[in-house]
């Protein structure tokens, strides 16, 4: 009888140990999964912050170069326009990777990035297109002999130049906001983006 009692207790202890082991294994597995997901999400957020920080830093440098170039020689000459097209190319990279933006947990930062890039893309397209149209109109003006037609073309050219300049000023004013967004990305990225600006200025 005593043997049976001890046998029962031994079996019960074994069962408790098995159940306890199963519970601990489940908790351990769950904790590992949660931790893995957190680390994965954190890594994706950091990569997204690095990506957008690099894009915005490059755009800030390119647009500053464009503004400096515009003040030398022909305002919308080949070099300035090449710079503006380079800035547009940076926006194209953003467009192709837009879903990466949602890896950033800060909704306010996401909204600021998206709004800023939209506000830059529209006037950039406008300035680039207007420059091409103005070039074509000037060619037409040279070939035009009719005084009325020439006067109409000259008026259109002047109006388009004013609109283009307004669009360019909007780009410059909007580009001034890039720095604050880049600064907001640095803690998330764990990286300072001043390096690009320092190299560009050296």
How should these model regions be labeled?
Residues 1-40:
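Membrane-embedded hydrophobic alpha-helical segments
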Residues 35-57:
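Juxtamembrane membrane-water interface segments immediately C-terminal to a transmembrane helix
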Residues 50-202:
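Interfacial alpha-helical end/capping and short helix-turn segments at domain and membrane boundaries
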């Amino acid at each position: 009888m005593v043997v049976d009692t001890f046998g029962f207790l031994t079996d019960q202890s074994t069962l408790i140990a098995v159940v306890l082991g199963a519970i601990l294994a489940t908790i351990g597995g769950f904790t590992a999964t949660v931790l893995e997901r957190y680390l994965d999400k954190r890594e994706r957020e950091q990569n997204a912050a690095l990506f957008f920080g690099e894009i915005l830093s490059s755009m800030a440098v390119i647009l500053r170069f464009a503004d400096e170039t515009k003040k030398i020689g022909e305002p919308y000459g080949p070099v300035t326009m090449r710079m503006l097209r380079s800035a547009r190319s940076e926006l194209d990279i953003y467009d192709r990777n837009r879903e990466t933006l949602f890896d950033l947990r800060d909704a306010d930062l996401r909204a600021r990035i998206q709004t800023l890039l939209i506000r830059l893309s529209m006037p950039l397209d406008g300035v680039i297109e207007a420059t091409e149209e103005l070039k074509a109109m000037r060619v037409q003006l040279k070939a035009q002999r009719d005084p009325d037609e020439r006067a109409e073309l000259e008026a259109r050219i002047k109006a388009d130049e004013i609109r283009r300049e307004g669009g360019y000023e909007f780009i410059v004013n909007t580009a001034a906001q890039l720095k604050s967004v880049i600064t907001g990305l640095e803690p998330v990225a764990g990286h300072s983006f001043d390096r690009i600006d320092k190299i560009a200025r050296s």
